[in-house]
């Protein structure tokens, strides 16, 4: 049992699927968390209409363009210290299973790089804040 909003397009369409469907779902969870608990096309009330909108004719590039035009992608990038997290989420959420990470290990590697960069940035920020107080 799953939520349509987090369901990979091939699962929703009743087509054969593999491990990349889980990667898609995880990507949607990360998108949701990084975007103030909003999903793509969150202005649409019906989750079925939202998933249909994501799937109908949108390539990954078009999806990024639409997100940017609505100010969502900019918001995500502001909340993410490094663009690699944005790219990781978009790769995980690709409509085409072949364009997604092919394993959780591959996705984990990019997430670990991102975490390392975020932690380094946070440490620098804390040091800068402490120095400002002196």
Positions of predicted regions on the chain:
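Conserved end of the kinase activation segment
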Residues: 11-19
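Conserved C-terminal C-lobe helix
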Residues: 79-93
């Amino acid at each position: 049992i799953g939520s349509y909003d987090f369901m990979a397009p091939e699962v929703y369409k009743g087509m054969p699927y593999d491990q990349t469907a889980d990667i898609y779902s995880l990507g949607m969870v990360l998108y949701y968390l990084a975007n103030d608990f909003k999903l793509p096309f969150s202005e649409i009330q019906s989750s079925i209409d939202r998933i249909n909108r994501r799937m109908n004719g949108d390539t990954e590039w078009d999806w990024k363009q639409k997100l940017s035009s609505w100010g969502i992608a900019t918001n995500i990038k502001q909340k993410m210290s490094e663009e690699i997290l944005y790219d990781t989420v978009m790769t995980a959420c690709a409509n085409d299973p072949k364009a997604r990470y092919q394993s959780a290990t591959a996705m984990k590697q990019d997430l670990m790089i991102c975490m390392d960069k975020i932690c380094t940035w946070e440490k620098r920020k804390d040091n800068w804040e402490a120095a400002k107080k002196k």
